[in-house]
């Protein structure tokens, strides 16, 4: 399925909702989508 990337392990996509980028500050965690090797950005922020 994939060769490398934060959402790829052993040439397979990681499962959907696997955390690929931990939250920092008011940002929320980013999760693998189970379809790509990239780590899609979560557009949401924690409420102020």
From Swiss-Prot:
The keyword Disulfide bond applies. It is found in: Secreted. It comes from the Eukaryota. Disulfide bonds join 2-11, 7-32, 8-37, 20-39. InterPro entries: Disintegrin_CS, Disintegrin_dom, Disintegrin_dom_sf. Keywords: Cell adhesion impairing toxin, Disulfide bond, Hemostasis impairing toxin, Platelet aggregation inhibiting toxin, Secreted, Toxin. A motif (Cell attachment site) lies at residues 24-26. One of its GO terms (cellular component) is extracellular region. Expressed by the venom gland. One of its GO terms (molecular function) is toxin activity. PROSITE patterns: DISINTEGRIN_1 (PS00427), DISINTEGRIN_2 (PS50214). Residues 1-47 form the Disintegrin domain. Its main location: secreted. The disintegrin belongs to the short disintegrin subfamily. Inhibits ADP-induced human platelet aggregation. Belongs to the venom metalloproteinase (M12B) family. P-II subfamily. P-IIa sub-subfamily. Monomer (disintegrin). This is Disintegrin leucogastin-A. It comes from Echis leucogaster (Roman's saw-scaled viper).
């Amino acid at each position: 399925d994939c060769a490398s990337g934060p959402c790829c392990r052993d040439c397979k996509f990681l499962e959907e909702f696997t955390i690929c980028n931990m939250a920092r500050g008011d940002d929320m965690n980013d999760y693998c989508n189970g379809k790509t090797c990239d780590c899609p950005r979560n557009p949401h922020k924690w409420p102020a």
